[in-house]
Amino acid sequence: MAPGGLLTLAGAAAASTAAAAYLDAKLHLTKDLNQLARAERGAQNFARAVEQRKASGFFLFEAAAARLGDAPCIWSRGHPEYSWTQTYQRACQYGHYFRDLGVVAGQHVGVYLYNSPELMFIWMGLLSIGAAPALINYNLGSDALVHCVRLSRSRFLIYDDASDCSSRIHEVGERLRDINVEAIMLSGSGTTGLPKAAPITVARNYPSASLLPKTFGQKPGPNGDRTYYCIPLYHGTGGIAAMNDLMSGISIALAPKFSLSRFWDDCIESGSTIFVYVGELIRYLLSAPASPKDRQHRVRLVWGNGLSPELWTKFQDRFGVSDIGEFYASTEGVLTLLKHYRGGGFGLGAVGHHGWLLRRKFHNDYVPVRIDPETGDIWRSPKTGFAERLPYERGGEILARLPSRSAWAGYWHAEEATQKKLVENVFEKGDLYFRTGDALRRDADGHWYFLDRLGDTYRWKGENVSTTEVGQVLGSHADIAEANVYGVQVPNHDGRAGCAAIALKNAATPDTLDWSRLTSLLRSELPSYAVPVFIRVRETVGGMSTDNHKHNKVPLRDEGVDPRSMGSKVPGSEKDRFFWLPAGASKYVPFTERDWDLLSGQSAARPRL
């Protein structure tokens, strides 16, 4: 071939390569293909394990322990560091112990423990005999505790010798005996309504646990990563992640619970390179005074869910953490979204990403729909009876399609609660969808963004207000450490008026805070109907969240804004102070009992909101 022809071919090849690279960058084809391939490999791994009668995560852990031997496996404050061999031996000891108690495959054992190595030994030991733990929130007591134990259908309850746990067990001891539950103390182990239990099936957990490399690039092995867990392991995020680490050969570090003062000390002393967060944990870390320890750790990756978008860059800049892995997933396991963020701004704040292929694949599987704001039910056309699909870029409650009723295990022995999450005949006769209860949107680039938990959305002046959006704007103020936004009922007004409970920082007080500046910020960043009518200044940072570091709006919402009611639903809040923004006001001003009485009255002098 003539030189000119070769050049022509080379040019065409280069152009083709450049075009392919452009399309890949634009449509994210390689990323989507890799994600689909991972899912297929996980399914194949599970199918192979079923054929070999080894479809339990315990066998993955057993193989990891055989490979890693004396390498460090579990670190915990106040405990010796356990090797993989020691961890495996302790798990087997517990397996024999539970078998001797009469526990058999398919049964559950109640576990009421703080994070500790013993919890992991017990969990893995139960898996070794085909049983499983029923992990119970160690903050529960009284009726809620008995409810969870009864729901587990367990004959045994292993509990912590910590004084608060043991005292709560003793308080309900007679009631446990009435339901034939034997409480066994483990010595030396160092939002509304009663809880529902979402079972984590082997078919759901095994595929992800069997895959390497991990989702966010975590590295197994003696010179690999170590993940720090201070979030409760009885929650899905922490518990599943920690077990998956052990099944994958990734060592872990445990703290009994989150401690702001001990957090970075633990990361440094344990040599952790990763930690898992939930909810407001990152905000708490940022609220602490700057310290040399902010950069003395080895943490390179944090991952979890619920990290407010306005905190991503602040966290990375202050603590020198290069990677953030945000995900969205329901404990029920019907929908999972992932976003690996390394900076640069593209996709900042996203909880997941779908390229062109995944957007096509899941077009009818993950669907935003219109919700009736008054009833909270899916809106249906009076003519057809079907739901209204909303544009992805606008967003709405996400429904996840189920191929059959058996595709979701449902809540453990809670058929009524299970049925409330299922909806049929959504877009056509015979279809079946799962209600996530969460509103998300997806932009033109395929990034998914969390809008709100719909139960927390409120309607004001005919508009739906996103509590997350309002909270993010408040969180950007230099003197606000934490903001919890919700809607409150006000006499003589329809819907709910916005209220934000805030905690201050930088020595700011209600009297020194620049209320004019805050008012200007809110009015410039939010539509008028979304600007909170009321602001409640709390006494402390961190007092507005649940044990899982997620904002608990219910007590604050139920207490409302009547100053006389302060402390009736929120213990220790008697010294909180209310401020409000009446129509036409230039800034927030104190809200008094007299103001409440005027709002409640029928005179023409009643203030406008």
UniProtKB/Swiss-Prot annotation:
InterPro entries: AMP-bd_C, AMP-bd_C_sf, AMP-dep_synth/lig_dom, ANL_N_sf. Pathway: Antibiotic biosynthesis; cephalosporin C biosynthesis. Its EC number is 5.1.1.17, 6.2.1.-. It comes from the Eukaryota. GO terms for biological process: long-chain fatty acid import into cell; penicillin biosynthetic process. Residues 545-570 are annotated as: Disordered. Keywords: Antibiotic biosynthesis, Isomerase, Ligase. CDD domains: FATP_chFAT1_like. SUPFAM superfamilies: Acetyl-CoA synthetase-like (SSF56801). The keyword Ligase applies. Disulfide bonds: none annotated. It catalyses: isopenicillin N = penicillin N. GO terms for cellular component: cytoplasmic side of plasma membrane; lipid droplet; peroxisome. One of its GO terms (molecular function) is isopenicillin-N epimerase activity. AMP binds at M185, L186, S187, G188, S189, G190, T191, T192, G193, L194, P195, K196. Together with cefD2, catalyzes the reversible isomerization between isopenicillin N and penicillin N. This two-component IPN epimerase system may function by two sequential steps, an activation of isopenicillin N by the acyl-CoA synthase component cefD1, followed by epimerization by the acyl-CoA racemase component cefD2. Belongs to the ATP-dependent AMP-binding enzyme family. This is Isopenicillin N epimerase component 1. The lineage of its organism: Eukaryota, Fungi, Dikarya, Ascomycota, Pezizomycotina. The gene is cefD1.
